A protein has these predicted regions:
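A conserved acidic, glycine/proline-rich C-terminal tail/linker
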Residues: 78-87
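Extracellular disulfide-bonded cysteine-rich modules/repeats
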Residues: 90-101
Length: 115
């Protein structure tokens, strides 16, 4: 299955004496069984029975995940909210997470089931 991205936002990054232009995708529609974050602001999960999203703290600091299917969210290191190895969210739920000092925290959610 494919990954659909919205039109990219163009970024110019200045580092030392170099200028690098990047295309930055902020919204992503995922219809795969597994996906690892790449710095998106919003991921919408749909068109699969179950999906697993891995939060990559090297590329992503803050993210919202809206799911139209069952979804399991796992961190790349540590635990979510210092307690959970993973969180499971059901169809129609939305959760916002932020990485602070290497720990992923749930900032807001609807329909989060902490199993």
């Amino acid at each position: 299955m494919s990954i659909l991205r919205e039109t990219p936002i163009r970024k110019t990054v200045f580092k030392s004496n170099r200028t690098v232009n990047l295309n930055d995708f902020k919204t992503l529609i995922v219809n795969k069984d597994f996906y690892s974050t790449l710095g998106e602001d919003l991921i919408i999960v749909r068109d699969v029975t179950q999906s697993k999203i891995k939060l990559d703290s090297k590329t992503t600091e803050r993210i919202k995940i809206k799911t139209l299917t069952n979804c399991v969210i796992i961190p790349d290191v540590g635990k979510i909210d210092e307690d959970w190895d993973e969180i499971s969210i059901g169809r129609g739920a939305c959760v916002e997470l932020q990485n602070i000092n290497g720990v992923w925290y749930v900032l807001s959610s609807d329909g989060v089931k902490m199993d």
